[in-house]
Each structure stands twice: as structure tokens, then as C-alpha cells.
Amino acid sequence: KIDPTKKYVNNHYHPKEAEFISINQYFIDKKVNYSAIGMQAHMQTDYGVLSETDLWNLLEDYSKFEKEIHFTEITVTSSKRFKDWEEHKIYLKKRDDLRNQGKDLNLESLDEYEIYQADYLRDFFTLAFSHPDLTSITIWNLTDLNAWRGHAGGILDKELNPKKSFYALKKLIKEDWSTKTEIIQKVKKPIVFNGFYGDYLGEVTIDGIKYNFSFNHSAGNNEAIKVIIQ
């Protein structure tokens, strides 16, 4: 029984697999009621890193289903990457053996990889954000402390200090993708501007008196937005 107030995501850890495309096509054909396609991208090996072409083609492959696309888990590590899955498995087995002995094995964040992590996440978010069907990106680890598989995949370090990637994403989200505008307009005339989706706070001055207002601009809304000033 489907709860219409919930958003259901068909999620897979390896979206490059043709089987996942087939599963989504099967769901569409059978009229399964779900909202979004979820995919994971844990880039802990050189082989697993998505190039710009890989990322765009992936989004295009799934856009034909006319569903929201979510990156439900992404990891871009600032620690050493492994060549491929076989090399990665050797490390994971060694780590598991140590953890079974009450010890631990974590990969240290490296300066050169912190620069790479910041640059890659900035480019990944920028390209993904530009695709009209992409609606959500979730970074799998906020901090390097107890990060998955011991990789330094957070945007905060083990002491919860911001890494370069934190500042790169902060600039994108809080500056580049925020709308700030100042308009001189006649009373009773509509205000027209281009802006990103989201919540807006505004201030209008009429006859020297300042009034505040707020509104939400969301996808799919093509009507004029009415606001109340107070």
C-alpha cells in the first residue's frame, strides 16, 4: 500500500549496470508508483571515479524515465585511492581483520588529495546541478571521523574542522547559487527577475517605510507569486 505523502526512490549502488536501467523500465511498464531513481557513487578507486562525460551520460540514460534523479550516496575521498576493486578488497580485508582484533585502520587525508576533493566536488555538483532531472545529492560522510571503510570522504576532518571541499561547496550553494537582487519598481507593477528555486526573504521600501516579505519559488510553479508585505 503506497502512502501518497511519501517519496519512493528506487536506489542502486551501481547505476552503470544495464540491469538497473532494465529494472526501471520494468517498473515503468508495470506502472509501479515511485517518485525517483537513486544512484550511488563511492569513488574510492581510480576505476570508480566518474569523468564529466560519465556523469552526464549517466544522468541522460535515466532521464528518459521522466523521474527525479537522486545521488543518494557519494564519496569523494581525500585519502589515497586504490587502482581498482581488487586492490581495494585487499585493503578492506586487512581492515576487517584488524577491526576483529579490536584495532582499526583508517586512511589519512592527504593535502594534495584535499585539493583534488574540493575541485572534484565543485565540478561534480556544478555539472549535476545543471541537469534538469537531478534534484538531490547526498554526501555519504560529513566528517572523516568513522567514515565508511576508513576513507577520508568527509568535508570535515576528524576534528570536525572544515576541509577545502567544505568551503568549495559553501561557495557554490550559499553564494553562486543564491539569488540576490535589487529592483526599483513602480507600485502595483509586478517584479520580474531570474532566480534559483528556494525560500526568499525580501524587503521593500514604500514612501520611506520598509516592509518585509517572504515567499517560496519551487519547480513546476509557472504562476505569478503573490506576497504580503508587513
What are the language-model segments listed below?
Residues 11-14, 40-49, 106-116, 156:
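The substrate-binding groove and active-site-proximal loops of carbohydrate-active enzymes
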Residues 1-20, 67-80, 135-144:
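Aromatic-lined carbohydrate-recognition surfaces of secreted/lumenal glycan-active proteins
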Residues 3, 12, 41, 132, ...:
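Sec/Tat-exported extracytoplasmic proteins
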Residues 29-32, 63-68:
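Short helix-capping and hinge/turn segments at secondary-structure transitions, especially at repeat
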Residues 2-6, 29-33, 131-133:
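Short helix-capping segments at alpha-helix termini
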Residues 54-66, 77-230:
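Aromatic-rich peripheral "rim/lid" segments of glycoside hydrolase catalytic domains that contact
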Residues 15-30, 49-59:
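Distinct, well-ordered alpha-helical segments
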